[in-house]
Amino acid sequence: MSKAKKQRNTSKHRALSAQQTIPYIAMHPDGICQIPGGLYTKTLEYEDINYAVASTEDQTAIISGWSACLNYFDSSLPFQLSFVNRRSRNANRYKVNIPAQEDDFNSIRGEYVEMLKGQIAKSNNGIERYKYITFGLPAEGVAEARPRLGRVEADVMGNLKRLGVQSRPLDGRDRLAVLHGQMHPGGREPFRFAWKDIPKTGMGTKDYIAPDSFDFRQSRTFRVGQMWGAASYLQIMASELSDKLLAEILELDAELTVTMHIQTVDQLKAIKTIKGKISDIGRMKAEEQKKAVRAGYDMEILPPDLITFSKDAAELLSDLQSRNERMFLLTFTVVNLALTRQRLENDVFTVSGIAQKYNCALRRLDWQQEQGFVSSLALGYNGIEIQRGMTTSSTAIFIPFMTRELRMDGQALYYGMNALSNNVIMADRKKLKSANGMYLGSTGSGKSFAAKRELINVFLATNDRIIVVDPMGEYAPLVRRLGGQVIEIAPDSPHHISPMDLQMNINDEDSPLSMKADFLLSLCELIVGGKEGLQPIEKTVIDRCVRLVYREMALGLETAKTPLLQDLYEELLRQPEPEARRVATALELYCTGSLNLFNHPTNVDLNSRVVCIVLKGLGENLRKIAMHTTNEFVTAAVNANHAEGVATWCYFDEFHILLRDPLTASYFVAVWKMLRKKGCVPSALTQNVKDLLASREIENILDNTDFMVLLSQAQSDRAILAKQLGISEHQLSYITHSNSGEGLLFYGNVTIPFVDRFPRGEIYDLLTTRPEDLAHERTDE
């Protein structure tokens, strides 16, 4: 008797207990499980990759790679693909990470936490999706099976990795936890197990995972604990299958397990079988032709079915012999579970409708409910004798990948809902190789809203500090509500930032005084202007004067005061070189002239946790100096925060305007390349993609950007972005005429379409810049 038959026959004995229903003999701590028929199996859990939003070329490449994975398994390596959708009724594993505090921000914190809880709860109505691959091989004992399974495990993980799929092997406890979840649907019963407890209690591993009861007395349904279940198989009748069939079943809001048991047919045996079928068809043709001759009609006229069978068999033989195709025997089952029988029947009906849509049929396993259920467990055991012959290509079309999820723990921030899976998107930018980010979207797309939502999430979930460079003044209301410092840099503003401020006590690789001298050199170069900039003698004189005006601070004298720009101006006038007078004359306008905005002591709190620098209402000359001074403040703040072990989130709005000045553009390249190493998390925002990409420095910035939020784009901008970022046509559809708050999120090598429907309330009013919303607020007031 073959091992397969032995395996199936064991399930025909009536189980006297719930434990006896579970078809394995022994589970070992390293994850090797012995099942009937002398097979030893191991299980891998693997993550999803982006297939649904990939380009046609990428989808073809994924299917080709998946075909290679399938072809790895030979006739001695049966394997099982398990797709388990579980409804979690316990506390969600993605918990809100915003701790309660007693401060002035309780109303905002409470509202944000409630929003986040609501979005997490809406994530597929609590459906959690898991994917497993279980493979087994025959062996005389576990000692013989262990090294062989180890090699297979390494090969399978390597094959998946080449597809970009992350996987991990499950140890014995992990596998028991999976089985416990499958036999305790609904997530009501916690899994409690430790190997050390087995000798103490005298219990077996099955005792820790078995439900209270199984009831398989009915022909078309069964009971597991308090839940109703139904086991069915997929009858594949379509001549051509769709890659959407499996995905649509798994996307349902239902608790179910889809299982594909796959047995590879030996290649020589498969070819021999097909040749035998072709010979049989040839004999049938000859018989039909003899009948035609005897009846007196054309012998070339054959029954249509016979012609079709002959053509299909010839193509199949060609595939097996020359196209790297293999033959598989597939058992495709679906086990639905629900709290009530009515809900169960509705769920089965829905799955059946999807099957019919793709010219397949879902058939109930009448009087085989027990065999169907135990075959769905991630053990590698198949008690169903219904098999369908499939080639590699037709098997690979049941592609096990849909969309990559992005749900991180710790200080992960909320970025909306996955538009494909409806799961919450939680990501931590600081875990990327480069945390640098960009927000790109046309006017009204929700670009500023998305950045402000991230900002408020950073404020509530972390202790990090935040700096906003705001050319239009849009962030001021939000920053004031967060207790931050709004600094308006303008000729008529009472706020002042001195470019001469210097912190001598920062532990840094470079001397603070040398860095300040370098900054003031570039500031003077900006002010003096000219094609050639400062001459060597002028640079020497400026450096000498900088050291003189900071002499007392450098010596650490108690009487030392922070100098002003005018002190540098006066020191330059005292120098004997004519070059010093030339520089001093250029500085005069900004010290004693009408543009003396920066010749005042700093009178704002630069140490506030949230600082917003508003650059609205500045002329061209002042704007350049203001931006240069702002950049110096950002650098100093990042250095100071890094010394304290705190990250700094920087937001640069209207980024395309800031890149127009070559000095500022080169500064941002340095930010994107160097400051990230000191805990800086910069974000650039713009609606003008053409101007952004016109900058000579944008290539360096994009090359160091691992985080990007793309919202609705104008047609010309879409074409530019598609070429620059390699966005597929399907992905472009998510930023084409999309609603506000809809778009694409790029996180490292993960691309996810997202939707953010933020509820109205105090936070919404702080974040929105839409004229109709602002008008509504004024009406309410």
Name each region found by the language model.
Residues M1-F401:
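Extended, folded cores of ATP/NTP-driven motor/assembly subunits in large transport
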Residues I49, T56-S75, R86, E248-L250, ...:
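P-loop NTPase motor domains
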Residues Y439:
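Hydrophobic anchor at the beta1->P-loop junction of P-loop NTPases
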Residues K447:
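Conserved lysine of the Walker
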Residues A450:
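Hydrophobic positions on the alpha1 helix immediately C-terminal to the Walker A/P-loop
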Residues N457-I467, A637:
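Post-Walker A helix-loop "phosphate-sensing" segment adjacent to the P-loop in P-loop NTPases
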Residues G483-I487, E697-L710:
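A short helix-turn-beta junction within AAA+ P-loop NTPase domains corresponding to the substrate/partner-engaging
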Residues L725-D780:
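Conserved P-loop NTPase
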